[in-house]
Amino acid sequence: MAHAFAIRDVRRRLEESNGGYEIVHRSPRLEIGVYVLVAPQADTQQPHDDDEAYVVLSGRGTLDVAGTSFAVTEGDALFVEAGAEHRFTGYESLSVLVIFTRAD
């Protein structure tokens, strides 16, 4: 089975509504979503039970992971291990593709 996703349309819709998260695919072992943050909205993520990867679609900011900060900009990819405290900061507008692996 295969799916195609219009990521730019999802991103545009979320940007127009001042941010949020929208799932574009969910299966037993994978979740893909688009996460848009618009200042002054805070990133209120809590640690997750699953590994997570981000691909920055647009914008720039900082990803703070367990006391380490990473400057991020369009095209960057990042990995966050399950259970790690993390959040985006220092952005005006930031759009990321989010990929969660699900444990068996």
Task: For every predicted segment, state its role.
Residues 28, 64-68, 91:
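Short strand-coil-strand connectors
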Residues 28-31, 38-42, 60-62, 102-104:
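Short, charged/polar surface micro-motifs in flexible loops or helix N-caps
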Residues 1-34, 41-44:
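A short, N-terminal "cap"/entry segment at the start of jelly-roll beta-barrel domains
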Residues 35, 54, 78:
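Conserved GNAT-family N-acetyltransferase fold
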Residues 82-104:
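Ligand-binding loop in jelly-roll beta-barrel domains
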